[in-house]
Amino acid sequence: MNTSVTSIKLVLLGEAAVGKSSIVLRFVSNDFAENKEPTIGAAFLTQRVTINEHTVKFEIWDTAGQERFASLAPMYYRNAQAALVVYDVTKPQSFIKARHWVKELHEQASKDIIIALVGNKIDMLQEGGERKVAREEGEKLAEEKGLLFFETSAKTGENVNDVFLGIGEKIPLKTAEEQNSASNERESNNQRVDLNAANDGTSANSACSC
Amino acid sequence: MLSPERRPSMAERRPSFFSFTQNPSPLVVPHLAGIEDPLPATTPDKVDVLIAGTGMVESVLAAALAWQGSNVLHIDKNDYYGDTSATLTVDQIKRWVNEVNEGSVSCYKNAKLYVSTLIGSGKYSSRDFGIDLSPKILFAKSDLLSILIKSRVHQYLEFQSLSNFHTYENDCFEKLTNTKQEIFTDQNLPLMTKRNLMKFIKFVLNWEAQTEIWQPYAERTMSDFLVEKFKLEKPQVFELIFSIGLCYDLNVKVPEALQRIRRYLTSFDVYGPFPALCSKYGGPGELSQGFCRSAAVGGATYKLNEKLVSFNPTTKVATFQDGSKVEVSEKVIISPTQAPKDSKHVPQQQHQVHRLTCIVENPCTEWFNEGESAAMVVFPPGSLKSGNKEVVQAFILGAGSEICPEGTIVWYLSTTEQGPRAEMDIDAALEAMEMALLRESSSGLENDEEIVQLTGNGHTIVNSVKLGQSFKEYVPRERLQFLFKLYYTQYTSTPPFGVVNSSFFDVNQDLEKKYIPGASDNGVIYTTMPSAEISYDEVVTAAKVLYEKIVGSDDDFFDLDFEDEDEIQASGVANAEQFENAIDDDDDVNMEGSGEFVGEMEI
Ligand SMILES: Nc1nc2c(ncn2[C@@H]2O[C@H](COP(=O)(O)OP(=O)(O)O)[C@@H](O)[C@H]2O)c(=O)[nH]1
Ligand SMILES: [Mg+2]
């Protein structure tokens, strides 16, 4: 068993109805890698992916619809290590919004956040839908801002896994140890308290290193 | 017992995607807001409950209702979450102060703000700070904590310990009048006093059952009780009532004080040698965001920047400022700060809470327990130059809490004193802290080493640090650099120690009888403003009472059972249930664990 697991908080951003939730659904319910079922916590969806002997555990924060009326909370971006900024290739407005979200992330989120720009719904182009955002436009924005770039279809599953693999690969392998030591340091310095670890003898899981 | 009017639960109202109870084997993908069915792009036409204001009580209520299966529309007239519980940046505070002084934020008055030029255009940016409008601490054994675990909202948050509770006495930060009588922590404490203290602690852990002891004092003050019944002296009495009990004045009644002292003691050592916790990045502002997110996941619709204009109780239609409307089949719940224009039913907010929030350019680490970044300082009645009658509480947060940058600290001072005296008391407390801090930083004084170990695992109950002792005469050369000072008066309907009682919410409930012609708020229910209480204790009570009004019973209030196969979380849930059981009786805390803890305190 591989013991080095890197946990990554990944947030989804983008205009309502571009397919954010569908991408997550596709990703977590696919037979992906040699992985088991996704695990469901009340807080976020989690999915483990093994990349080169190294396990990345994505903690995926969907917007829960809070983006629909411009109501995302600062807590949402906080400490996110990765973000998918999604737009719909058939909706130019959603690409303008994507720029806005990239800017917002650079202002609000941690400096070294890995952002993937994702043009979704490419299946619609085969079905006679008209492309309104050129692939080059997406590529250009990604290059300017240093983002990963993908075009996907949550419907057919095309490229969806690659988005997450791409992010997983950008997390350097050594980050695992770094992260562990960093978070250990943080715990001793900042006395982070795990609310699941009460001293009443019921919590035998104090050794967990998730 | 389910009451007959009880509304159907989520499970009954919605086709089950996956049954947890029947089949606890691996989940695939849950029914999620927006995952299974795309969410509509417009706000709903019809909801069960409309909530205006995203403060703590409203947010906890929204989450409880969403998970119960109610269709909730949750709005806020502000462009941020939190309302009366918000955590704001410096720029947001500037706007807020202007709004208060224009009279457009009700329940707040007399806001005065100073911001150093170092913030914004200099060394620090507005966003480096997260200032709570009503800061709170979380006791390790409390209703809210068990709900945080059950709802898993705690997974959105980070908590840190708070172990230092200082008492200021005798015109100086000498710990107490006579350091030899420092409560618990001094080996020189006379044997007799120690015995009396221990006797009291054993009693207080199970006080309700021992009516013969406290009933005769039920209508008298706590200090009479401690002095007469337990032969305790002023230093212990003060520390028990003010530092441990966090009470506001000497007139506190016996049952209230006992309950508050026990709150500290039973919370101690639940997660470690400290009684309370603070959330990182902000207090109630952060928690309300967490509960709102949870509610959204449970299906609630969120809309900020939305103001209620009126509610028509006959047609049950609520109208908003942007012209949109929604039909509300059950109840409209509003925070007093979100009351529509021409409202006539807002409950009277007759109690003042005076607050002063300062950001100081000084790390002040001397005041924190090692590794921590939070402390409480309590100024008991009569301890300040101003001759204060009410306590001034100062809640201190450092950079480790991520609400302010390295090298700075936030002081939240507040008092329950009413009227102009309050500001004098707060100013006196500020001056005392300033002086103490300057002495501290110049002297590099070490924390006191004399500590009696009280529990089996070597932890002390009270870890009060002597601040600046013996530097009473020291006159500092430097002055403290204040980056920010915000003074304001907040109004609330909840008196100090006031328990939110159900009848409060009946103000508008006598249906047509109480409708006022032309009022924009006939038939709505108002929530309570935060009181002066520094803990979250009132929040759950208020949310639960409102929940019961809406659903018909509070039996399934946060009756969530997140089962999943994530090992870690599964054990977390088991633990949460245990924990719940331990405090289920609310005021009647299960004494098994705590009894042991007393037993080990051999003297
Ligand atoms: N054709 C097509 N439809 C999609 C795709 N992804 C999502 N959708 C549809 O777009 C709508 C909105 O998707 P959703 O995931 O709820 O978007 P969100 O609001 O960004 O989370 C739904 O009706 C989806 O079925 C895609 O790749 N192709
Ligand atoms: Mg969605």
From Swiss-Prot, chain A:
The keyword GTP-binding applies. The modification Phosphoserine is found at S188. Interacts in its active GTP-bound form with PEP7/VAC1. A lipid is attached at C208, C210 (S-geranylgeranyl cysteine). Its main location: membrane. Transmembrane segments: none annotated. The keyword RNA-binding does not apply. It is found in: Endosome membrane; Mitochondrion membrane. A motif (Effector region) lies at residues 36-44. Belongs to the small GTPase superfamily. Rab family. This is Vacuolar protein sorting-associated protein 21. Alternates between an inactive form bound to GDP and an active form bound to GTP. Activated by the guanine nucleotide-exchange factor (GEF) VPS9 and inactivated by GTPase-activating proteins (GAPs) GYP1 and GYP3. GO terms for molecular function: GTP binding; GTPase activity. The modification Cysteine methyl ester is found at C210. It is a lipid-anchor. Residues 176-210 are annotated as: Disordered. GTP binds at residues 14-21, 62-66, 120-123. It comes from Saccharomyces cerevisiae (strain ATCC 204508 / S288c).
